[in-house]
A protein has these predicted regions:
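Short, glycine/proline-biased beta-turn/loop segments that scaffold the active-site neighborhood
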Residues: 60-86
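Mid-domain, small-residue-enriched loop/turn segments at the edges of structured enzyme/sensor domains
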Residues: 15, 112-170
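Active-site SXXK
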Residues: 29, 41-69, 238
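Structured C-terminal helix/loop/strand segments within mature extracytoplasmic catalytic/sensor domains
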Residues: 1-9, 116, 168-196, 206-209, ...
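Short glycine/serine- and small hydrophobic-enriched flexible loop segments
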Residues: 52-60, 103, 115, 160-167, ...
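Beta-lactamase-like hydrolase cores
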Residues: 1-38
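Stable alpha-helical elements in mature extracytoplasmic
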Residues: 4-7, 93-97, 109, 113, ...
Length: 269
């Protein structure tokens, strides 16, 4: 991992922004951390522990993935997602609400799920997953800030959560697999996987196939992408958080980091 570490350091060193990075090779156990305890505004990455909290409620038989959730006009919020555009009264299974929160970063779906499981249960799930520094207080797209604070994440914490998920230890082995399967369907692919060979092309020059279970987060000046890379029998957890950087440049750096991770995993296959 030393070569990968060196390449990633060279990518972020010229940046005027702040970067929090954790890369963990789950096959070798090697890990590299950079500003791993630094707190960043969570943006939509907070949706990953929210998903875990919902699966925890399902595991405890408090909810079922087949439960129908009815949409109410007063619950609609703006920003990412399609639920805000659907007819009020439309009902969708809980599994679809979770999926939309993850693969389209649907904010209305997120707030519905927060209401279902409760803030305290989400906080407890984060604690149980080893998220020592991160905080969760707020639903999304609210006009009034919470006086207790904002949703924040540290790269170390997100890395811990994803590592548990990748090893089948987040909530349960079955829940971990279901969460990974959802994240693999991600529609927002413009950061870590941007420069990877197209999974739909037959002209990849013999490069190994890859999968990425990821979740992005973005507001102006803040851009994150976190996930689990799968190449052959290799698995690597990547948490890359950034703030106070030009949006175009941060996306460019993230995509190059994703490419370097892929190249590293290809050499090890």
């Amino acid at each position: 991992m030393e070569e990968l570490r060196s390449k990633v350091q060279k990518l972020v060193k010229p940046s005027k922004g702040t970067w929090g990075i954790v890369l963990e090779d789950l096959n070798t156990g090697e890990k590299w951390e950079h500003n791993e305890q630094e707190l960043f505004y969570a943006a939509s990455v907070i949706k990953v522990p929210i998903m875990a909290a919902v699966f925890q409620a399902v595991e405890r038989k408090q909810l079922s993935l087949s439960d129908l959730i009815s949409l109410k006009k007063e619950e609609y919020v703006g920003g990412s997602g399609v639920l805000q555009h659907l007819t009020p009264g439309t009902s969708l299974p809980l599994s679809d609400i979770i999926l939309l929160m993850i693969i389209q970063s649907d904010n209305t779906a997120t707030n519905l799920l927060i209401d279902l499981v409760g803030v305290e249960n989400i906080q407890q799930t984060m604690k149980d997953a080893g998220m020592e520094y991160s905080t969760f207080y707020n639903k999304l797209m609210l006009s009034e800030p919470n006086p207790l604070g904002s949703n924040s994440i540290a790269a170390k914490d997100v890395g811990n959560l994803l590592s548990k998920m990748a090893q089948g230890q987040l909530v349960s082995e079955q829940a971990s697999k279901q969460m990974i399967d959802m994240m693999k369907k991600q529609q927002v692919r413009d950061c870590l996987p941007e420069k990877l060979p197209s999974p739909y092309s037959n002209f990849n020059n013999g490069m190994p196939a890859w999968e990425l279970a990821n979740k992005t987060g973005w507001i102006p000046g803040t851009r994150h992408d976190v996930g689990i890379f799968f190449v052959g029998n290799r698995k690597l957890v990547a948490t890359v958080l950034s703030e106070k950087e030009d949006d175009v440049l941060s996306k460019r750096i993230l995509s190059q980091i994703g490419y370097e991770i892929y190249q590293y995993l290809c050499k090890e296959v």
